Amino acid sequence: MWRAALKSLLGRKVRLLMSTFAIVLGVAFVAGSLIFSDTLSRSFTALFASTVGDVVVRPVGGQTASGTLSSLTVPASVIKELEDVPGVARVDGNVSAFGVYVVGEDGKVIGGLGPPALGVNYNDAPAAGGEGLELVEGEAPSGIDEIALDEATAEKAGYEIGDTVPLLTPRGDSKLSPTLVGLAGFPDGGSLNGATLTMFDTATAQELFLEGRDEYNDVWVTAEDGVSQEELRDAVEDLLPDGIEAVTGDEAADESASQLLEAVSFITTFLLIFAGIALVVGSFLIVNTFSILVAQRSRELALLRALGASKRQVVRSVQLEAFVLGVIGATIGLGLGVLLAMGLRVLFAQFGLDLSGQPMVFGVRTVLASYLVGVLVTMAAAWLPARRTAKISPVQAMRDDIALSESSMTTRFWRGLALAVVGMVLLAIGLGDIVDDVPYSGQMIGAGVLFILLGVAAMSPVISRPFLSAARALFARLFGSMGNLAGQNSLRNPRRTTATASALMIGLALACTMAIVGDSAKASVDKSVEESFVGDYVVSNVFGGEFNPSIADQMAGVDGVEAVLRQRYQFQDFGGEGISAIDPATVDLLELKVVDGDLADFEDGSVIVQESYAEEEGLDVGDPVEVEVPTGKTKWPVAAIYEDNPIIFLPVVTTLTMMEKAGYEPADNALTIFAEPGADDLQAGLDAVVAELPIVTVKDQAAFAKEQREPIDQFVLIIFALLGLALIIAVLGIVNTLALSVIERTREVGLLRAIGVSRSQLRWMITLESVVISVLGAVLGVILGIAFGVVLMYAVRDEGLEVISVPYGQLGVFLALSVLIGMLAAVLPARRAARLDVLQAIATE
């Protein structure tokens, strides 16, 4: 039996090729995701190990929960005291700032998306990891007119030593033009992973980022030989004043790396989800392929049964073929996964996450996961047709054609219906939980969608009969006898037809869902901007970060400006959401609808909160709100409760003064500009203020709405690109099914040619069969996609996405493309059928 199975496999190499390709693509996505994830983890771990000293002395609350620096610092007097501690080799103070952007020769900002733009003071303190940044060319900067850059940033910007480098700073002078005097890098290999690094001398960094105070953001303490990090930390701790802490370099590096890796972990999850989709779609192709091949081998298997082979042996022989196929597919997929990981590295480099300095990490888990996924998915998919074949008696298998009985399809229908009902229940629970932020809601939604898709796929041989019958009648009317034959061939084995269509159904269902989500999100943005937009212009950072507060002062002086409203945000510090701040003197300009309390009571030391948040937390006017800020936990009483407003999208609003006292840097996130009545050409005056600041833009209502829609468009395009993998597999499934069907019907094709059917008529018949399959999959996919999209948007209608918009034009394009897919998928199978030798085909058994 083992020998027979292997010979059968070798005898059908071409037929199994596209099934293998489905496994290859799915495994490649799994392997590529894991390799990229491991490379990302290794890179950040190595990076942070090179950016800490043996012991790091820092203020408690020196970093906000979102990873930015607070305004808390370490006084220089601490350094002098630490220098005399036994076991201390040297002590170095560090000044750091986010938002120091390098402007390239082309006038564009380097970086900005993702990895930070850092400004620091230069020192040559040794890193705990032993591979810190060092000057590799030039000299250290001295004075405000000199800087050093990391090599990668200088290369991207097009600067060499001696060039003048335009800089944008978060505070102080908005723009500087120092001279590049040095380049820094990792002599032993390493990378900043896309971050940009600008280095000043210590006095200049303190002047720019700490208002000239003799203070530091943190301090590195270097140990003498033979002194461990723990021993040095213990010796240092006793001398530190309240509010200052000491941690080992290893602890600081692990903490920073863990926070960042947790923040970017969604990348791996995101990619693995699409790997799963590809494998599910590929499973349909494998099931269909093995079903056809096993049916074609029915006589062969019947003879084996007649010679004494048991049902179990027949199943095992098919499973052996699947095992070999899975191993081959996993091996090729593993190799392709390495290339995919390299491609992901290049792709994410376009968004600022540059891992080019880090070699790819090929871990053991990647190999194990790839083979487990490839082999298990293939064997599981092949088990169903193998089990079904084992139930066929030797005498029954001698017949020319074997199809599922009506009772079998009816059983499949009821099982599929039960599966779909379970999926609906899971989907309802998950969508209800996601609104209430209950754990595992995402998994519930994913499982619900999968069960519904599988349920519909199981029911499709029954529910698709009216469609297939209508297609046969339409084709017969439009294309005559060839159209009638194509329709009858689709109806001959509805299970096979619908199984092939189901692969396309899954991809298009998800694509349609995302199309509706994207279109609804954009429509909701337009509506909220139209209803809630106040003022005449919005000023913001193109990277979504902070910008110099002096810009607001300059814009307030532009002719025609009546008022400027500042907004500042801090994310993830308050219940996982964040806090914002405005000036109480300008709060009336927001035109908030107050439901309780009075905005006149909003002052330093108090907050105003959104209505939905107040209801969720059970807050009334006067109740204290406990907030975790860099200076520690504090309580602010509620002065007023207002209706939710997208202009202030964070739930708790305090004053600018309290934000600064809480330990946050005084930098603005957005400005709303109010024009005086009759002011003309105000945009030109505002643009002039930021003419030399490419990171800050001025937008009217239409431009602001467009800016809010752009991330949605980008996200949907990425989703479509990833779903394209599933659609490619689905198209391969149609090609494979048609090709195997032609082989299965070789004798029938020969008879058609013998009675006068021309080659072009034969090609047209097979093309129509392909169109039926693809259109059926598209119709089912679009219907399910509309249902998923509408239900999903309805479930989150209270989360700011109030508009449900179905892009019927886009869905129509999907249906039109399905016809094109069907015609293209039929090219090779139709060509093969047309080229069959008539006499040999008739003689085929």
Region annotations inferred by a language model:
Residues 290, 323-354, 366-391, 422-434, ...:
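Small-residue-rich transmembrane alpha-helices
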Residues 66-70, 446, 450, 455-456, ...:
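Juxtamembrane segments of multi-pass membrane proteins
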Residues 497, 501, 566, 668-674, ...:
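C-terminal transmembrane helical bundles of large multi-pass transporters
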Residues 2, 6, 11-19, 23-280, ...:
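Membrane transport/envelope proteins' first extracytoplasmic loop
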Residues 27-57, 291, 341-349, 430-449, ...:
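Alpha-helical transmembrane segments
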Residues 391-407, 834-845:
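Short cytosolic juxtamembrane segments of multi-pass membrane proteins
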Residues 11-18, 266-269, 365, 369-381, ...:
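Alpha-helical transmembrane segments, especially those used as permease/efflux helices
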Residues 1, 8-15, 275, 282-326, ...:
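Interfacial "coupling" helices/loops that link adjacent transmembrane helices in transporter permeases
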